[in-house]
Each structure stands twice: as structure tokens, then as C-alpha cells.
Amino acid sequence: MSDLESAYRLEYFEEEGFHRRECVSCGAHFWTRDGDRETCGEPPCEDYQFIDNPGFDASYSLTEMRSAMVSYFERAGHDSIDPYPVAANRWRDDVLLTQASIYDFQPHVTSGASPPPANPLVVSQPCIRMQDIDNVGKTGRHTMAFEMLGHHAFNADEGTDYAYDGEVYWKDTAVEHCEGLLADVGVSLDEVTFIEDPWVGGGNAGAAFEVIYRGLELATLVFMSLERDPDGEYEMKDGHTYAEMDRRVVDTGYGVERWTWMSQGTPTVYEAVYPDTIDFLKEQAGIEHTDEEAELVHRASKHAGNLDIDEVADIEDARAGIAAELGVDAERLTELVAPLEDIYAIADHSRVLAYMFGDGIVPSNVGTGYLARMVLRRTKRLVDDIGADVPLDELVDMQADRLGYENRDTIRSIVRSEVEKYGETLERGGRRVEQLAEEYADRGEPVPTDELIELYDSHGIQPGMVADIAADVGATVDAPDDFYSLVAARHDDGDSGAAGGDGGGDDRLADLPETETLYYDDAYGSEFEAVVLDVFEREGEDGDGAFDVVLDQTMFYPEGGGQPADTGVLTGDDHTVDVIDVQERDGVVLHRTTDNPGKGEFVRGQIDTERRRRLMAHHTATHIVVYAARQVLGEHVRQAGAQKGVDSSRIDVTHYERVDRETVKEIERVANEIVRANTSVQCEWPDRHEAEAEYGFDLYQGGIPAGEQIRLVHVDDDVQACGGTHVARTGEIGSIKILNAERVQDGVERLTFAAGAAAVEHVQGQEDDLRAAAEVLDVTPAEVPETAERFFTEWKDRGKTIDDLKEQLAEARASGGGAGEEVDVAGTTAVVQRVDGDMDELQATANALVDGGQVAVVGSGADGAQFVVGVPDGVPVNAGEVVGELAAMVGGGGGGPPDFAQGGGPDAERLDDALSRAADVLGDAASAE
């Protein structure tokens, strides 16, 4: 089995006089110009060497640093492209957040299916890494929000069938570019080390370097050239084997924040990136240090790199080691640095939230919405912990302003709404924490991590809050240092997966040509002629035989993008078969039929025209309703799911508040304005990158298509990537009627609507219902609402009167107005009485008797046999046991607390017999007590 050692022996290293060394501390191999160097240069092998000793010739702000880095690569022949959103699920279905610049080009470009927007290129990509959340603030270098500047080159062997081929540049040139940039900002190249660190991810692998300077990793250079192969010659650190592939991708990442920090030499990266925010938070929290304290904090910052939770077993032990090295008490050091660590985290998290909400993420209980909510709640707790009297929306707005987002009002509204919801959630969840803490206190065990994560997931209650409540009842909490990383890992996954179904793995299917789709050329066409290329025998849903028919061309639209499949018939020379479903597999359209039309036969296809027209109207209406919702609710609104239908359709949209009736009416009004405008619906097939550059990633409301060209559908000012069938003009829809709005999950509203003929049918149906109600009430349809309200009020009043009369009747029975039997039970009078009323009457009678100091046994035969037993304080009778025995006599059961219980059974004929034995049951119960 081969390793990658040869992959690291570059001609550039040989020409420049590099040496390959092994770190005496960690054992890693690295390359350096300094032949006497013994360590790799990365913490914990070395501390930060640039604090108070900036590593560049000049000091840069984040903006200046980004500009300098991009300019360098532009001069080196790279095209600069605009960054993508932080919500990677806008163009990918396998991940949620953008964590590296290479995410911009996965999977279509890296796989060779699509060309890159430029080659080579450079991009400064905003990223969010949830797995770093617990390190933020502690190590001095970790930020959850950061910009990764990547210079990328996409190479492929000549003659391969990819969207690009030929060699742009590879490892030697990439390393040369890296050193060129370092030299450009004044770095002493003798101090730089290149640590060998093979990279593995997503089924690919390759050699990689970590570029270290004065204790700080400034860049990672990944050379993606391997793919997983059980017969591959390279065994990688994930335990799998890999083989060389015919594509090679230069994937580099330079942390712009870290470069900024290196240029300034501040104690932490946070002072370099968020100076104004940190000063503001220190002032709000009232943090002031003496000169001696400030000097101690400053010295400690140089060792902060040793607090990486991924590298140390216990943070407090690691901090104690730093304190010992500094010659101070560990508790004293923690008192000084912990509030600062919280402030650093608040600054970083506020930027994360600005990125998330600025890019349209809406808080919810799933996906990116959950991650946003988690960060927001943690940030709110940190703000409260440091005692800063500042609204969270103000802190997030400071970052949104700096990042240049135009939807700042919406961002602030989202934050305020979430903070309010969080308060309500904490109030509800506090009772659950008390119960759980008491349970583990009784066991003498700490509250386990799984319970802490569940409390956070369900109620947003953080470990520190659990610890405070648990301490009051004698329970302990020992949350892991990486708690928030564990929580994020539960949710930081995309919805990856491919559609299954019959035919997906059939070898014959793979050999068939792609089906020519006629419905794009003529969405109004209903008839066509075709040749049957193949027929696959299947098992139908009812167990009967079924067939998947492949034609050379088709007018039948296959199910996709939330639009159901067309149905219809295929007619041959001597028979006709029904087409009951249509699916597409890798470009081949499968027509599910009830009979075999015959391979090689010539057939005529006829689709159900009325069904197609209704689906077209509903699909175009879906685009219109989403657009109208964005106009009314805000630009943060995005499609979270859709299902078109013949009679109605539904669209799920992201929004942070409930949509009330007046808002629904406004969305409907805007949608119908577009319909009445009779706007032309246009379709085009532009280059993917050109479309993304012009319209952004809001194109992908209904899914992410593959390919170099994508189909765009223009409806009024709305543009979406879409493969569905549409009307030619919006006026053909006729009208759109929103039937219902409901919250299907937190942060997602579902709008159900009908379009065209279906809208008319729904309105007519509602009118029929209204007229039917009017006839029952003997009023005109216009008078139904007022009459219904009056009847409802009268009904409530009568119900209250009935309840009052029941109480009066119960009191009368209890005071001697009934025919009950009185017996003595342990010196207290017990009344055994039959009252053939409902359960409310039984309970009222029993309560009245108990209030009078009597034991009550009340039975009813109105609905089977039912009992209620009530016992005053101080009487040695257990009501639950008594009612259980009585209920058993009538074939049922019951129970309850000792003072009041109820039960019953189906055998009403034995009710009187059971009541006649109640005195004995009461006597036995009193004796037992």
C-alpha cells in the first residue's frame, strides 16, 4: 500500500532549498527553508510568536487585507468572482452552510459536470463553521464566521469528457503563489513551515499542506486528486483506499481574519476584526482592568492556542497549565479571561447571525433555521452573563451594517421576535429542568450530556442554566467542553439523497438514449407519435403486473419539482394502454402502463389535456404566489417546499412570524394583479454561471438542477430555475384564491391555494356552503355571520345557565334533596347516591357533599356505569381504591388520587348492585387504612 510521501516532494521545494523535517514535539512532517528547525511551528508545539510582533510590513484592516490578497491573485492571472451566500443549501442539497470556498463549486464543477465561472479564479468567501463554536473566544484564533480566500484551478486529463480539460496549474505553482503572497506582505519566508496533512472528504482525497507562520496557520493548500476505490493503492486516514482520478483540483483556503490578525499583532484575532464591537461590549459590561491585570491577560493570550477543545482533553486543566506557566492562580486567571472570552464570542456570533439573516435564513426547528436559532440563543445567554444592557438586535445590526446588508430592518425584526420566543420557551422549560434535576439528585448521578442536549433542543435551555437550577436541588451538571459542537452536529447535515424507484439500477436502462422531451417545445401539445425502445416489467402497487415503457420521444411530463406526472394513453395498431404515472431516471422517461404495448412498436400518445392545463396553471401560480409573498412579507421569504395539484396546490415559505388573515389577503391581491396584467411567461436556457451572476441563488426556489445550462422561467419580475410546464401568459390562469394559511413548523408557513378553474370551483363550493347555512338559519347569506355570532353567544349563555342549574341541583342533593343512602365510615357520614346525569353532574354532586364534610359515592347509568368518589380531609379512605373496586363490579376500571377519583364500566345493569355494596367497600377501605 502506497503513502503520499512522494506527492509532497515538489520541484519547487528542491529548487528553493527546502528541507523535510519531523517535528520533535508532535511527529508531523513539514517542509522549511530553515534546516535547523526542530518543530512544526503550530500550537501546542509552539506558542504564538506574532503577538506584539506583527508578521507583516504593514497593519491591515479586514477590508484592506481582503483587497490586498485578491489583488495579488488577480495580478497572478486569476479572475476574481463574487462570493456565494453562507446558506449553501441554496445551490446544494447535501450541506447546509458554506464552510469553505470550494463549497461554491461542489458538486457540479469539481465533478466535471459544469465548467467553473473562471479558471483559475479567486474568491473571498464568507463561511460559517458550526463545529468551531466551542473554541470561539478561547483560543484567540477561532471564529465561527470568517472569510476564506481561495484560489482555485480545475485540471483534467486531455480528451476526457468533462466540462473542462487541460492543465491550468498544480502543486508547485500553488505553493509558489502562496509564498509569493507571503513575500508580498513582508513575511520572512525562512520562518514559514508547510506541514504535510493529507486531506479526505466527500469521497475524494489528496495531499495537503498547512501553512504556518509564527505559530498561526495562515493557509491550507489541498490538492484533490484521488477518489475512493476499494482497489486503490493509497490508504488514507479515514481507513479507505483511494486511486488517482483524471481530474485534479487546487483547493486552497486562506483565513482573511487570521492574516489581518497577523498584520496587527493584537492579543487575539477578535481585537483585529471586531475592535469597535469589543470596546462597546467592554463598556456595557463594565469591564476594567488594572495595569497589572491587563498585562496578565496580555501574556495569557500568547498561550491561548493551547485551549483548542479538539486538541486537549479538558479545558480547565489546560488553563491551569497556562496559569502555572504564568505563575498565577488558575482561578484568578479564569476570573479575568472568562468575561473577555464571552465578549469575543458575542462579537463573532453577532456576525454569524448577520450573515445568516442577511442571506435569508429564518429561525426554525430544522436545518439552517435551527442552527441560526442555536447561535442566537447562545449569544443572548452570553450577553446576559456579562451583564451588558444592550439589545441583541442592536449588536447584530452593527455587524449587518458593516457587512453592507440592505435588509437590516428585517434582520432586527427577526432577532427581536426570536428573543421574545426564547423567553417564553425558557419559562415553559424551567419546570422540566427542575423535574429532571430532582430525578438525578435522587439517583446521586450528574445530569448526563444526552439529557442536556435534549433540553437544549427542546427548550433552548443551556447547560449553565441547567446547572444553576440543578444546584438548588442538589444535582450536578458536567457539560462537555464541546457541548455546542455536539448539538450542531445533530443538525449540521444536508438533505442529501437521490430519488429511488424502479428502473434506477437496470443495466438495460443505462444503455438507452435520453428521451427527447417534447413538452418544453410545446406545453400545449397533447398528441405525439413515438417508437417503443424498451419495456420493463414491474410489479404494480396493487400487486398486479405493470410496465415501464421507454419511448424515443414523449409529450408526457414526468413527476418532478413538485409537479405531478401527466396521465393519458398510448395507442398502437390493435390496442390502447393507459399511462398512469411517468418518472424520469438519468434522462430516460419511464411511462408506467397497465399493459405491454410491445417493444419496437409504433404508438400514438395522448395526454389528459384537462389535467395538463390545470397543472400548468397551478405551477405558474406557484411562482406568482411565492413572488407575491416576498413582496408582502420581505426578501427573506424563500420556498421551503411545494406540491402542485389539479384541484389545489400548496407552497411552504420561510417566515419568522405567523401570517394573519389580512396579510394573506394582501398576498392574494398582489398575486391576482400579476394575473390580470396578463404578463408573458418566458423560458430560456442560459449558462448556469451567467444566470447565477445575474439573478443570484434565489433562482433555486424549487431545487438545484444539474448541467451547464439551466432552464429559467420568467413570470413578471420573478425568475426561477424550473423544469415544469407553464402557461404562456399569466392571464390564462384566470384567478388565484388562497384557501388557507397555516404554520407547518416553526419558521415555515404553508399557503394552500387554487388557480384557474379550480379557484372558481372552490369559490362556488364555499358559496354553496354559505347558502346551505343560510337556509338552516332562515336568513340571507349576508346575514349568516351576524346570525351565527348571535346563536353562538346564546349557546354559550345557555351552557352557563345549565352549568349553574347543575351546581344548584348538586347542592340540593347534597343537602338532603336526593334519595341517597347514608352510612357511617370511621365516624364520618358517607352518602351513596345514584344520579343519572353526565360526569359533570356526578363531579358537582360529589364536590358538594365533600364540601359539606361527607364522603361521596355517586353513580350514574346515563352512559354505561360511572362512579365518582370524594373523600374529605382527615378521613382514612382512599378514593382511588374505592372507585377501582366499584368499577370492577361493572366490568371496568378507574382510579385517581386518595381524595377524589372516578371510573366506570360498560355494564350499567349492575350499577345498583355495585352501589348497594358501596358501604361494605367503604368500611373495608377504612379498616385497611
Swiss-Prot record:
GO terms for molecular function: alanine-tRNA ligase activity; aminoacyl-tRNA deacylase activity; ATP binding; tRNA binding; zinc ion binding. The keyword Nucleus does not apply. SUPFAM superfamilies: Class II aaRS and biotin synthetases, Putative anticodon-binding domain of alanyl-tRNA synthetase (AlaRS), ThrRS/AlaRS common domain, Translation proteins. GO terms for biological process: alanyl-tRNA aminoacylation. It comes from the Archaea. It catalyses: tRNA(Ala) + L-alanine + ATP = L-alanyl-tRNA(Ala) + AMP + diphosphate. Zn(2+) binds at residues 619, 623, 722, 726. Its main location: cytoplasm. Binds 1 zinc ion per subunit. The keyword Ligase applies. PROSITE patterns: AA_TRNA_LIGASE_II_ALA. Its EC number is 6.1.1.7. It is found in: Cytoplasm. InterPro entries: aa-tRNA-synth_II/BPL/LPL, Ala-tRNA-lgiase_IIc, Ala-tRNA-ligase_IIc_anticod-bd, Ala-tRNA-synth_IIc_core, Ala-tRNA-synth_IIc_N, Ala-tRNA_lgiase_arc, Ala-tRNA_ligase, DHHA1_dom. Its cofactor is Zn(2+). Pfam families: DHHA1, tRNA-synt_2c, tRNA_SAD. Keywords: Aminoacyl-tRNA synthetase, ATP-binding, Cytoplasm, Ligase, Metal-binding, Nucleotide-binding, Protein biosynthesis, RNA-binding, tRNA-binding, Zinc. Coiled coil: none annotated. One of its GO terms (cellular component) is cytoplasm. NCBIfam families: A-tRNA_syn_arch, alaS. Belongs to the class-II aminoacyl-tRNA synthetase family. HAMAP family: Ala_tRNA_synth_A. Catalyzes the attachment of alanine to tRNA(Ala) in a two-step reaction: alanine is first activated by ATP to form Ala-AMP and then transferred to the acceptor end of tRNA(Ala). Also edits incorrectly charged Ser-tRNA(Ala) and Gly-tRNA(Ala) via its editing domain. Consists of three domains; the N-terminal catalytic domain, the editing domain and the C-terminal C-Ala domain. The editing domain removes incorrectly charged amino acids, while the C-Ala domain, along with tRNA(Ala), serves as a bridge to cooperatively bring together the editing and aminoacylation centers thus stimulating deacylation of misacylated tRNAs. This is Alanine--tRNA ligase. It comes from Halobacterium salinarum (strain ATCC 700922 / JCM 11081 / NRC-1).
